[in-house]
């Protein structure tokens, strides 16, 4: 069931980001993408709060029933409130393939059910693997890599909070453990509201400074315009927050100190993720959903591995060295920003 839930939810991020890229111009896309990813980023942070309350009051099975109710409400909302936006569905079916009749008139040839079935099967089983070819593009691969590293840290921190604060010297109850995720959630909210506007402002500023204008006098944007201080500052902040969290929890310092720094982690991490995702829609113009789907593939694969390894690593080397290592990896990986600033304007090919 978790496998099916993961597959279904991953499509929302890819299709949703592609829709945002189609509806919003480049100059406002960062703002729109920030609001869109407020949901995916807040989900893993808000759910422990709700889950902690349900578990404390009704037991762990209540979390599963809560997920069923929530899923049903979302499904009903999609059926009755979400309009169809596909031009093919709105305007009618595609015209059938035509052939010449004996009298010279063109007659439509209906497509057989078998033919439609194999075409649909090919789209489901073959086309997704062809997308992996886009990863041969260095700009696309580097963007997906850095977004995946930051998202894996996001999962590791969430698991570490639960493990660390449920044991001595803290020993918090389930409901309190859930509330500990609030600062990180607040950081993600601030990043989604402010970060997109910041990124759009930086892009407009860089295009104007470079003197790139079209015939109408409007700035001409490039993906590399987004890689400025709006990327460098959070690239320093969120690894620093990981480092502080690791050492303060290792020393058993009062819970307020390590939990407050999770706000800065959520802020910096979400800024990086939103900027990277927005940039992906511009590196692969016209195929934004493909780019975001590749990003989902990389980040979820890495996050899965990180989730499996977190508990053994915490037991073996402790929070201090695990988060020190993560901070070093993230700081070293931030060199991707420098590379993308210089080499991200060439569109890749599959």
UniProtKB/Swiss-Prot annotation:
Disruption phenotype: Significantly increases oosporein production. Induction: Expression is positively regulated by the oosporein cluster specific regulator OpS3 that binds the promoter at a 5'-CGGA-3' motif. GO terms for biological process: intracellular polyamine homeostasis. Coiled coil: none annotated. It comes from the Eukaryota. GO terms for molecular function: polyamine transmembrane transporter activity. It comes from Beauveria bassiana (strain ARSEF 2860). PROSITE patterns: MFS. Its main location: membrane. The gene is OpS2. The chain crosses the membrane at residues 3-23, 34-54, 65-85, 141-161, 174-194, 227-247, 253-273, 312-332. It is a multi-pass membrane protein. The keyword Protein biosynthesis does not apply. Belongs to the major facilitator superfamily. It is found in: Cell membrane. MFS transporter; part of the gene cluster that mediates the biosynthesis of the bibenzoquinone oosporein, a metabolite required for fungal virulence that acts by evading host immunity to facilitate fungal multiplication in insects. The function of this putative MFS transporter remains unclear since its deletion leads to increased oosporein production. This is MFS transporter OpS2. Pfam families: MFS_1. Keywords: Cell membrane, Membrane, Transmembrane, Transmembrane helix, Virulence. The keyword Cytoplasm does not apply. GO terms for cellular component: plasma membrane.
